[in-house]
A protein has these predicted regions:
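Beta-strand segments within the central parallel beta-sheet cores of soluble alpha/beta enzyme folds
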Residues: 101-103, 147-154, 184-196, 334-339, ...
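C-terminal nucleotide
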Residues: 1-64, 89, 93-124, 221-380, ...
Length: 428
């Protein structure tokens, strides 16, 4: 929705969007001025970077938390995930250059020509590749693309396991959908577009869970058995009523040089599936996998076999977690969160990058969190693993001490206490 920049600023200052912002950020209307100021700041950034514009739109895409199903999505498995109340926001306005120009705070300006949307090998692992890929996906869906200037600001920590990359992809998708498709593309399709751009243009073999959680929003369970039409179901749950706080612990490690570690997981799982006659592990019954373990060990190696064991167990846990949440059986839910985390460390092996000795930040974070929880709540590696974050469900009466103790180890501001956001990618 485009409005004049002066109108946006007046409305934001006067609190005209307080109710909307309160819903997006899980706070009271009285607590929204800080969020309104963020949107006013991206409008300022848009004009400072690109010059005066007559009108602009405002957009948001949330980070996500993976609650169940660690590395199951790329094997067409099940996941449990939710959007959270930290996000990436943008102001976007038309330009007459037939270029998509994107300025993210703290990064270099990125410009792509909308007349040339072909994938470029030399552009892999760059922001330009994601932009080019998403624009091409919208063009294929009938979008009449034209020049656009975008200014982005984020409070989603980069490389933190809350999935800043998915939030970026969803944000761009929401903008293109609003500006060129009258919001006709569904949240599920926007997620699929982001994944396609990341796989084909960016060159990273990712699953679909991150994009789906950010785009669809709230808590959802997704079954990717039919990859083209994943089954998405809402799961109504209020962790605060259970006396639990959701904490995301930033270990301080960075994903930057770990693409090969991430890629090895889906590659090894697919290799096991191939030995067993499938494309992905979801194609292969567990009994068939068991019968083929000797051949899998020989052809794929033992780590691949262990990763397959993790997939089957964590994939089965997801519907059990959903059932427990729907029945308000939080004790059973927490036991399964713990079991998932143990499986990720022991079998999936995505806590410590291969060969790392001095730097094992995620492992230290898990060990410290378990110590301070003293058998209460639950702790698990969060998201892709190897670096980034750890998820903890913390009894609210322990939260203050837990946060203080963890930040003594990790550093100030490293324990994020989050809420589940009720909406995914959004046009303000």
């Amino acid at each position: 929705m485009m409005k004049s920049i002066s109108t946006w600023k007046q409305e934001l200052t006067k609190g005209a969007h307080a109710a909307r912002l309160a819903a997006l950020y899980c706070c009271t209307p009285d607590e929204t001025p800080a969020q309104a100021a963020r949107y006013a700041a991206v409008l300022d950034g848009l004009e400072t970077t690109f010059g005066a514009h007559t009108e602009a739109g405002l957009y948001s895409a949330p980070g996500r938390t993976e609650i169940g199903g660690n590395h199951t999505d790329h094997q067409h498995g099940r996941v449990l995930a939710g959007s959270v109340n930290i996000d990436m926001i943008a102001a976007a306005a038309p330009n007459s250059l037939n270029q998509l120009r994107v300025q993210s705070e703290g990064y270099d300006l990125c410009v792509i020509d909308l007349d040339d949307l072909t994938a470029r090998k030399e552009e892999e692992n760059t922001t330009a590749s994601l932009l080019r890929g998403e624009c091409e996906a919208f063009r294929q869906r009938g979008a009449k693309l034209s020049g656009l200037d975008v200014y982005i600001s984020s409070n989603v920590p980069k490389g933190s396991g809350v999935s800043s990359s998915a939030a970026f992809e969803v944000l761009v998708g929401v903008i293109l959908n609003d500006c060129f498709m009258d919001e006709k593309v569904s949240p599920i399709a926007i997620a699929q577009i982001g994944q396609w751009a990341e796989n084909v243009y960016f060159g990273k073999p990712c699953g679909l869970m991150d994009q789906m959680a950010s785009s669809v929003g709230n808590i959802i369970t997704i079954d990717f058995a039919d990859k083209a039409n994943p089954d998405v179901e809402p799961v109504q749950v209020d962790f605060s009523k259970a006396g639990l706080a959701l904490c995301i612990l930033d270990s301080g490690a960075d994903h930057a040089d770990l693409t090969d570690e991430y890629a090895a997981i889906p590659n090894e799982c697919r290799a096991v599936a191939a030995v067993c006659g499938g494309e992905v592990l979801r194609d292969v019954p567990f009994e068939t996998f068991l019968a083929n373990i000797p051949a899998c060990r020989k052809q794929c190696g033992d780590r691949a076999v262990l990763r397959a064991f993790h997939f089957y167990a964590d994939n089965d846990r997801v519907p059990q977690q959903v059932a427990a949440l729907r029945e308000d059986d939080f004790d059973a839910f927490l036991q399964m969160v713990t079991a998932s985390g143990d499986s990720s460390w022991e079998y999936l092996q995505n806590v410590i990058p291969a060969g790392y000795k001095e730097h094992q930040e995620v492992a230290v974070t898990i060990a410290a969190a378990k110590h301070y929880l003293s058998g209460k709540g639950a702790v698990r590696v969060h998201g892709g693993g190897f670096a980034g974050t750890v998820q903890a469900f913390v009894p609210v009466e322990m939260l203050a001490d837990f946060k203080a103790n963890m930040e003594k180890i990790l550093g100030a501001g490293r324990c994020h206490v989050l809420s589940i956001r009720p909406e995914g990618g959004a046009v303000l």
